[in-house]
């Protein structure tokens, strides 16, 4: 078994396609449940953000697992399998590990170096764990990816240039209406993105923030946090949105809803009471879109959506920081894979030692039968001597096979041990199933590919 990644992101598809593939927690649970119905898939989790949808799965066979995942995503999105594969990328085994480490480090983000994706990876894993859809392989992979992401951000300067999507949107807004200091804002959505938007607005010197959220208590908690920055803030339910737009200079919407929450009628009603003509900037960070597409056609309204953000020149990361981050990822990938290969040979080594112990015990029993009058102290000395001899004979080859197994292709040494000592594969598998350190994963050198589900 090995890890298979099937994904679509801002690098491979336009926003319209990402919208079709966008998922909420309920969708993700259904997708994973459908994927796991196949005997070819044993573990799975979904990483879904505003600019990517990726399924990580442990599969019994590459092509079979790929077909299962592709068909499930095709059914979910309403896209034909043929159309979906035009925008999909596939990574397998080592390439899948490298990709997740790069994603967690912010190297694959729309804005390189942003830290928000690290939290998104953490939530994807936590959700899968709570639904019991990850086992040992994805557990260890996810935990290592999170550790790698933290290391990259702590040891390099990549996050200094890695502004969030919110920061890029606000930069575009300032180009349109000038500095945000002293202005009034509306934040639609009080989740993690809404909180990030409020923080960025506070840093920009905004004077007042109105929070609009379906759950008023959650909106009030965010408003209270905003007031901690010394900024006036109140929370409102959704039906208060139109009048709040009347005095607003900028709106940031990021609810994660499956359909638009800011309608053309809402904006019409809000602007109808504006005393003096002014520009209203609406940053639509939802995926799918939070704002009705028709709103962009209103005079004086400037909509910044994900399409626009992804076309913007992103914050430039210093070459040295990016190179340092990639170097860390490469080192961590190599260490992780070496550890997995050693973990795979460990059950064979354990089975060999158990086989040797069984032989020793059988011979001691034979000794007891042949020399029933043997003094117990002499018998113990013989037993200890035999065990020491066996341990010394096995020490060098078992240590060496673990060292050799850490290199690519090292599984051949475990196979040689099994062959030379006639170790039953069922016995090895039984040991593997009982050891917490064992990992399922046949790290085959399969290529990273960017489509082909149709062969």
Curated annotation (Swiss-Prot):
Pathway: Porphyrin-containing compound metabolism; protoporphyrin-IX biosynthesis; 5-aminolevulinate from L-glutamyl-tRNA(Glu): step 1/2. It holds the Pfam family Shikimate_DH. Its EC number is 1.2.1.70. Substrate binds at residues 49-52, 109, 114-116, 120. It comes from the Bacteria. NADP(+) binds at residues 189-194. Keywords: NADP, Oxidoreductase, Porphyrin biosynthesis. The active site is at 50 (nucleophile). GO terms for molecular function: glutamyl-tRNA reductase activity; NADP binding. PROSITE patterns: GLUTR (PS00747). During catalysis, the active site Cys acts as a nucleophile attacking the alpha-carbonyl group of tRNA-bound glutamate with the formation of a thioester intermediate between enzyme and glutamate, and the concomitant release of tRNA(Glu). The thioester intermediate is finally reduced by direct hydride transfer from NADPH, to form the product GSA. Catalyzes the NADPH-dependent reduction of glutamyl-tRNA(Glu) to glutamate 1-semialdehyde (GSA). Possesses an unusual extended V-shaped dimeric structure with each monomer consisting of three distinct domains arranged along a curved 'spinal' alpha-helix. The N-terminal catalytic domain specifically recognizes the glutamate moiety of the substrate. The second domain is the NADPH-binding domain, and the third C-terminal domain is responsible for dimerization. PANTHER family: GLUTAMYL-TRNA REDUCTASE (PTHR43013:SF1). This is Glutamyl-tRNA reductase. It comes from Mycolicibacterium gilvum (strain PYR-GCK) (Mycobacterium gilvum (strain PYR-GCK)). The gene is hemA.
């Amino acid at each position: 078994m090995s890890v298979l990644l099937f994904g679509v992101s801002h690098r491979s598809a336009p926003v319209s396609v990402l919208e079709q593939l966008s998922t909420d927690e309920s969708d993700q649970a259904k997708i994973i449940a459908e994927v796991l119905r196949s005997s070819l898939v044993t573990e799975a989790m979904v990483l879904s953000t505003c600019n990517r949808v990726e399924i990580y799965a442990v599969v019994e066979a590459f092509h079979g697992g790929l077909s299962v995942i592709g068909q499930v995503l095709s059914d979910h999105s309403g896209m034909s399998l043929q159309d979906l594969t035009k925008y999909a990328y596939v990574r397998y085994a080592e390439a899948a590990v490298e990709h997740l480490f790069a994603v967690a480090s912010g190297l694959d983000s729309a804005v390189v170096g942003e830290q928000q994706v690290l939290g998104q990876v953490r939530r994807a894993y936590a959700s899968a764990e709570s639904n019991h859809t990850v086992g040992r392989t994805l557990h260890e992979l996810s935990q290592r990816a999170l550790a790698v992401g933290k290391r990259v951000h702590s040891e390099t300067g990549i996050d200094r240039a890695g502004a969030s999507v919110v920061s890029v949107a606000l930069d575009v807004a300032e180009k349109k209406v000038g500095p945000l200091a002293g202005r009034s804002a509306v934040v639609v959505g009080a989740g993690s993105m809404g909180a990030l938007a409020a923080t960025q607005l506070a840093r920009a010197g905004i004077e007042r923030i109105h929070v609009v959220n379906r759950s008023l208590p959650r909106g009030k908690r965010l408003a209270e946090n905003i007031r901690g920055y010394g900024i006036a803030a109140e929370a409102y339910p959704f039906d208060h949105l139109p009048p709040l737009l009347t005095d607003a200079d900028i709106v940031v919407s990021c609810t994660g809803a499956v359909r638009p929450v800011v309608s053309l009628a809402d904006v019409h009603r809000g602007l109808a009471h504006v005393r003096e003509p002014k520009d209203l900037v609406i940053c639509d960070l939802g995926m799918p879109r939070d704002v009705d597409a028709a709103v962009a056609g209103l005079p004086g309204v400037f909509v910044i959506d994900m399409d626009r953000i992804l076309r913007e020149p992103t914050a430039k990361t210093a070459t040295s920081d990016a190179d340092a981050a990639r170097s860390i990822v490469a080192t961590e990938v190599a260490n992780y894979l070496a550890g997995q290969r050693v973990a795979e040979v460990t059950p064979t080594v354990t089975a060999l030692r158990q086989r040797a112990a069984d032989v020793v015990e059988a011979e001691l029993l034979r000794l007891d039968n042949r020399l029933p009058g043997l003094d117990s102290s002499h018998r113990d000395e013989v037993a200890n001597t035999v065990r020491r001899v066996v341990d010394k004979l096995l020490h060098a080859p078992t240590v060496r096979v673990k060292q050799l197994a850490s290199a690519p292709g090292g599984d051949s040494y475990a196979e040689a041990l099994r062959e030379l000592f006639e170790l039953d594969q069922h016995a090895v598998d039984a040991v593997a199933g009982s050891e917490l350190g064992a990992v399922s994963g046949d790290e085959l050198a399969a290529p990273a590919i960017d489509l082909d589900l149709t062969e």
